[in-house]
Amino acid sequence: MDLAALRAKTPDHWKLATAIRVLAIDAVQAANSGHPGMPMGMADVATVLFRNHLKFDAKAPNWADRDRFVLSAGHGSMLLYALLHLTGYEQATLDEVKNFRQWGARMAGHPEYGHLEGVETTTGPLGQGISTAVGMAIAEKSMAARFGKKLVDHKIWVIAGDGCLMEGISQEAIGLAGKQELDNLIVLWDNNNITIDGRVTVSDVTDQKARFAASGWDVLSCDGHDAEDIDRALTAAKKAKRPVLVDCKTLIGFGSPNKADSYAVHGAPLGDAEIKLTREAYGWEHGPFVIPAEIKAEWEAIGAKGAAERAEWEARLAALPAGKRAEFERQMARGVAPKLAGAIRAFKKAQSEAAPKVATRKASEMVLAAVNPVVLRNHRRLADLTGSNLTKTSDIEDFMPGNHKGRYMRYGIREHAMAAAMNGMWLHGGVRPYGGTFFCFTDYARGAMRLSSLMGVPTVYVMTHDSIGLGEDGPTHQPVEHLTICRATPNTWTFRPADVIETAEAWELALSSERTPSVLALSRQNLPTLRTKHEAKNLTAKGAYVIAEAEGKRQAILMATGSEVEIALKARALLQAEAIGTRVVSMPCMELFAAQDEAYRKRILPAGGVRVAVEAAIRQPWDRWLLGERGMERKAGFVGMEGFGASAPAERLYAEFGITPEAIAAKVKSLL
């Protein structure tokens, strides 16, 4: 490629794009770690995007009506960091660029939400960014339908690489976006035909443009190193009536004389000798991290070009009726609905009196029917299991093309994209998402669920059919290890409520959470209401509490969750009949119990006596409460699952696997 000709054709563009490239090269070299090739290859596309098309104001990084820019190919993070520094984001200082990938750096190896203003989402696991962006596009459509396009009218731009498009989640996401006709979503494909193993063709033959077209997208193409051609394609993309893929044909490591267009430039520093040659090829005579003042000033002018449009938008917001303005600001700030606690208390009082025997998945549906009128931002999602998960209430319409006021989306069989899109909705602002599937299929959503926890996105995962209690569908659908996986994930609340009252309390906590996602593990089988005396206080908020005290001298403590609390209470009755004083502790959320002070934990789990945990799942997370917290190994036992389940009616399964009142009582007596 003739670099001199390109430089002569668009000299102003060339110097702006070269500033991105050299910052990326220098930062990776200084860190002795990183991915210079992608920023070098996509610098031209990014320059045209930020210079001519992206609606943003670097001095107001949280402006509600800004365009969102998602770097799905997160390994090329220095592309984003260079742009943020050059355009004048306050936190993106040159010192931060020099501190790339170091301890305490805002500029982490892959972009991390919350570390640096201008980073819209955490990316790095390939495919997550493009899928999260679909959720942002959905949230934009939802907010525009509620508040009007004078207040909400922006695009979601994504840079995705070959790896993003190979990941299975990308097909889930693009199929969903195509079905929903998300014309506010534009994906810029860094089509450089390189992976770590070499050419993309060594592992893939997919016609990506045909794939997107078949999924309901418009597809455009451009020369990713021709500024005028890039501008033409992006201008056309903004006018489309469907989501758009722009195929940007690029060279990875553009300008490197010996490493461009090869895997060698993907994930390693260029080295001093190659950097010298590359600078010469660019015509760049400045040293490491040096950006001439006139180029920095031009970039900062690009960063400020949205200020006037933002001021006009703020004037429109200020002109709204006070109530509507306050509601818009509250929703974008992700505030908790002020009437939520009252609605939950009223629901609990009514249900403790009625004492229904219902599955906790049904209890969840009942809670949602009670709180939906006061939590208007709830946007719910289902992976093709509406009738099983029970997350759609009668007052909710479907979100679809032509009805973006709808708050219920049918995802199809796309668990992973559902989870990622929910992350995007919350990150965009204005939507409090929850979505559901069978608990066993959290396996399909794990990557995005982990990012919820890492980013502090308080998504609610409604996971039903939580144990062998689902019965005849068998071990492919019966979760036994999934509670352990969720509990092992940092910054995750895993709720397994025992009845309708605990279900309501779990929902209150999940919808009030600011930075922690929640998993609600809910039963298929009916469970009795255990707490028939109304308690205004949210007992689940403590994570564990005494649901039945020992009569006489306490000799044993039974700990249980969910459907096994009822079984533990029946075991208590058997033991008390033999004068074995037994306390039953319901532990709907281990994480919240662990967060309580030692005095409270000691009151619930005092020293001495036998401890037996009961759960239709594997033992692993229980050892802290059985052996630690003043417990003793010789007096600790577990009644639950040691392997996978089987296909049979639920009652038979509980009997065959020994999760019965009689087995629990026998375990206690064997340890006395």
From Swiss-Prot:
CDD domains: TPP_PYR_DXS_TK_like, TPP_TK. GO terms for molecular function: metal ion binding; transketolase activity. Binds 1 Mg(2+) ion per subunit. Can also utilize other divalent metal cations, such as Ca(2+), Mn(2+) and Co(2+). The active site is at residue 415. Keywords: Calcium, Magnesium, Metal-binding, Thiamine pyrophosphate, Transferase. Mg(2+) binds at residues 162, 192, 194. PROSITE patterns: TRANSKETOLASE_1, TRANSKETOLASE_2. One of its GO terms (cellular component) is cytosol. Its EC number is 2.2.1.1. Belongs to the transketolase family. This is Transketolase. It comes from Rhodobacter capsulatus. The lineage of its organism: Bacteria, Pseudomonadati, Pseudomonadota, Alphaproteobacteria, Rhodobacterales. The gene is tktA.
